[in-house]
Amino acid sequence: MAAFSEMGVMPEIAQAVEEMDWLLPTDIQAESIPLILGGGDVLMAAETGSGKTGAFSIPVIQIVYETLKDQQEGKKGKTTIKTGASVLNKWQMNPYDRGSAFAIGSDGLCCQSREVKEWHGCRATKGLMKGKHYYEVSCHDQGLCRVGWSTMQASLDLGTDKFGFGFGGTGKKSHNKQFDNYGEEFTMHDTIGCYLDIDKGHVKFSKNGKDLGLAFEIPPHMKNQALFPACVLKNAELKFNFGEEEFKFPPKDGFVALSKAPDGYIVKSQHSGNAQVTQTKFLPNAPKALIVEPSRELAEQTLNNIKQFKKYIDNPKLRELLIIGGVAARDQLSVLENGVDIVVGTPGRLDDLVSTGKLNLSQVRFLVLDEADGLLSQGYSDFINRMHNQIPQVTSDGKRLQVIVCSATLHSFDVKKLSEKIMHFPTWVDLKGEDSVPDTVHHVVVPVNPKTDRLWERLGKSHIRTDDVHAKDNTRPGANSPEMWSEAIKILKGEYAVRAIKEHKMDQAIIFCRTKIDCDNLEQYFIQQGGGPDKKGHQFSCVCLHGDRKPHERKQNLERFKKGDVRFLICTDVAARGIDIHGVPYVINVTLPDEKQNYVHRIGRVGRAERMGLAISLVATEKEKVWYHVCSSRGKGCYNTRLKEDGGCTIWYNEMQLLSEIEEHLNCTISQVEPDIKVPVDEFDGKVTYGQKRAAGGGSYKGHVDILAPTVQGLAALEKEAQTSFLHLGYLPNQLFRTS
């Protein structure tokens, strides 16, 4: 309890955490919880099972509770914002008139865009119709920027249309896409003065107090339009001074600060953000936190954690809701109508409820994207951007929207691009590093070669049912076509999976298949072997986990596997992502994943907590034709076996190429074993029992001790010398004083 309390976690949550036997925070929790409680956006990456869910759930629960408590007691933040219009009452950059990657500090004056490929701009909250006016901009780094003036009609890309005037760091002035030499270049630590004389129709600039001369004459078509301070940035940071602070280089010749302009000269921005500002009145269907998960199982797992963490929170109590598909929407709607504070859900149902107005995002304070790489790989990038655009950037109590992104890897290009677009100066917490295979995992490859192993010819019809990709092809022995070898691979993989289970007498394993139909076919084959879901204790007892199974069945199947009622969990990557299953002794990859990171995710499920684990991958030596649905039904009722490039829904799958990519990614060569799947014992480990802990002090540990022993002895001698020297220095002056 004390360990979590030291990070600022409230006692009620710390008590609940202690009851869960979490005596100390994990590394990811120790790093992330204080950052989130401090109000920052956080990108976090750590292994599955490292406590990521707690790392974001604990601070989210606490801040939601504190927000509700403040509302209950009638407190408001320092910068209460009742409507978007109140933002317009002061001179600042307008949070409702800016590019998607343009960030504005809490003072409204410090601005930044870290997009390196695109320009993102912003205008101020007020403009001017008359008079002579001046403001300053200080450059905080060496990024690219343009500053100046524009009308409400102008593009945010300042100077690229006929309604804006810009001056850029490269020493160019710009108007209507015409870039001409002007003044001189400016960069970090320079201060640019922006002058506007509306009465004469002149625009000019200064650098560090040096007048650069007339830049533009305002054309007649803009004489009756208000001009607003504006800028556009590319990987740059600026700070505006509209006159509230003392100018570094005060203007002369009758120019006055914008903040001192008479009210009659001022025009407020039309972008008041009414649709983007948190409403202060209570809305039952408007949660304070939205947590998006890629699968039902992960969403349920996260919700259960939230229920445990909030166990002792009272007055006000927090109300949570799970929004997932496959469950009657009316039940979810009835809970929404009674009020909800934290929503955990999957994209499909969330999108439905938001688009129909049943779920209101106007009061969301936290947006959490769990397993963001999984969400993006499933094609939910547009959904995430739509959700983010509907959530106000500033809440009713003046707090900024916090975005937390959890990902198995932060090195994904898509995750980086997403973070640049929707996050505000995020802190990266990467405790995962480069992918590697733990010491407790043995992983081997079994080549599936239909040309050398002709077992598939002798099986007749007593083999696993295949996926019907070759239903219209001639796959009979002797055809010697790519289709025949492909069908043979599918048959052999079913046999090899059974052989692996028998050879290693597996009592528990996760079996990964590439598609849902592959999972179903393998389950049916295990039923033919006498096993299946209802055969508790049988050698081939199994359950299936994938997106086409009903939610209740998926939940029940997962629980039965965890309890040990069945030996095997047959699943797809998507269904298994992030599920909290620990210490499984075996994993079988019936097909290698098409994303190399998923290989590490799969085999990382064995050999945890110092328990040895074995991962067996069945890798075809020939190309296999597989389903790759691009149709609108996503495979339901689709029998189009033509190749994708011919308008169909199949591709040729090259597992040998995937294997080489995985080996390159891990910087190792994966051992291959014969089709009899007898795995040779590692010479350092001696006899291995998978699922059991390694022998204490076993392996090559003794060798490490021998190597390090001289260094440790040297350090011990150095420490003794330092301590002795310190004591001599401490007592010697006193002894000298006594003798004198």
Curated annotation (Swiss-Prot):
> What InterPro entries does the record tag this protein with?
B30.2/SPRY (IPR001870), B30.2/SPRY_sf (IPR043136), ConA-like_dom_sf (IPR013320), DEAD/DEAH_box_helicase_dom (IPR011545), Helicase_ATP-bd (IPR014001), Helicase_C-like (IPR001650), P-loop_NTPase (IPR027417), RNA_helicase_DEAD_Q_motif (IPR014014)
Q: Which GO terms describe its cellular component?
A: cleavage body; cytoplasm; cytoplasmic stress granule; cytosol; mitochondrion; nucleus; tRNA-splicing ligase complex
Question: What keywords were assigned to this record?
Answer: Acetylation, Activator, Antiviral defense, ATP-binding, Cytoplasm, DNA-binding, Exonuclease, Helicase, Hydrolase, Immunity, Innate immunity, Isopeptide bond, Mitochondrion, mRNA processing, Nuclease, Nucleotide-binding, Nucleus, Phosphoprotein, RNA-binding, Transcription, Transcription regulation, tRNA processing, Ubl conjugation
Which CDD domains does this entry report, sorted A to Z? DEADc_DDX1, SF2_C_DEAD, SPRY_DDX1
User: SUPFAM superfamilies, per this entry?
Assistant: Concanavalin A-like lectins/glucanases (SSF49899), P-loop containing nucleoside triphosphate hydrolases (SSF52540)
The main location is nucleus
Q: Domain comment, in the record's words? A: The helicase domain is involved in the stimulation of RELA transcriptional activity.
Name by which UniProt lists this protein? ATP-dependent RNA helicase DDX1
Q: Which gene encodes it?
A: DDX1
